[in-house]
Amino acid sequence: MGFQDQRSKEAFARANGVLPGGVNSPVRAFKSVGREPIFIAKGQGARLWDIDGNSYLDYVLSWGPLILGHAHPVVVGAIKAAAERGTSYGAPTEIETECAEEVIKAFPSMEMVRMVSSGTEATMSALRLARGVTGRNKIIKFEGCYHGHGDSLLIKAGSGALTFGVPTSPGVPSSVASQTIVAQYNDLEGLKEIFKECGEDIAAVILEPVTGNMGVVLPQPGFLAGLRTLTQDYGSLLIFDEVMTGFRVSYGGAQGRYQIDPDLTCLGKVIGGGLPVAAYGGKRKYMEQVAPSGPIYQAGTLSGNPLAMAAGLATLKLLQQEGVYEGLEKKTTRLAEGLQSIAQELGFPIWVNSVGAMFSAFFTDQPVIDFKSACSSDVERFGSFFRGMLERGIYLAPSQYEAVFLSAAHTDADIDYTLEQARDVLKSLG
């Protein structure tokens, strides 16, 4: 039986009656790839099954958290054992401390950690902390970098060299947007000009050290080190949003891979083992300013939830096994380079950026080093590629500007099959 999606279509129609756009997060609606979404029934290992019975090799992995694959038996066992003792206490537990200790071992720049429930919560809290400890209001973010849906982060670049932000969403006050300056990723000289203009007012610079939300874009040599020096010179905090890259591009994240220590770090995704967990942390002198030890407030009913801590701790312990990251990177590189090779052979313009266990294939003929070059991608052609791959049992992110993720559960045979299907789809696109 070939690809079927009637039940998913019916489920989406039903969902549209009670959920805005039929989904609980916009990209899940598949709008940018020209079709309706599939509805998932279950996941196991590297595979997903939808409610129509179609099976897929999954390269989305819940947008990155499932680095061990779906329903890993050790992680599931940890969740079950925790649930039998209670699902939430709203009180301290030993496992919170144990999780924090494991995170700190992996990220030496983090001397203290606060657990929260989402990446958005982590970045919002880190920015509040940066403003609180510096006494400054302005922040710098980079065009194309996504840090959650906090008001001060839903900002795009305005016009001119000193690009004070403008809101990208109704409901974000212009007074909030005006406190955010939007810079260009990998443009260190442009950043220097911004700091010359208003460096004494800048509380923090926040960025994905490797971007994942305009697709995977790698830092150019010297960019992160120059940014570290620049922020130190002006007394501004450097915040790495490693929600996506933490425990994925290496066990110690992008900062471990590139040997750059930020002042504050935001984590999420992998540290929850598939459950809602995030964290922010950094140097003790800053984190001690967070309530109740300091005056900068942050709280959460489900922060440090015992089920999430159990899943996260089990995941981190498994990731510490010898050879895990070497295997992940080897498979990722093989898939990324294989796709690039097939595209070149067939005369398709595709640019691939790959690092650790994530990569992006941009449908463009130019190097992708920033937001502008990422936007040169042919999104319609990507949409056609996505649909063709989906119908052949390959589940990619439904957006040109998202990453491909691999897990420890993906096999060489999975990669072979994926490349075979990619060749067929690209041939069909002419």
From Swiss-Prot:
Protein family: Belongs to the class-III pyridoxal-phosphate-dependent aminotransferase family. HemL subfamily.
NCBIfam families hit by this protein: hemL, PRK00062.1
Subunit structure and binding partners: Homodimer.
Cellular localisation: Cytoplasm
Name this protein carries in UniProt: Glutamate-1-semialdehyde 2,1-aminomutase
Cofactor (UniProt): pyridoxal 5'-phosphate
A Pfam family assignment: Aminotran_3
Gene responsible for this protein: hemL
Molecular function, one GO term: transaminase activity
Top-level EC class as recorded in UniProt: isomerase
Residues where N6-(pyridoxal phosphate)lysine is found: 269
Catalytically driven reaction(s): (S)-4-amino-5-oxopentanoate = 5-aminolevulinate
EC number: 5.4.3.8
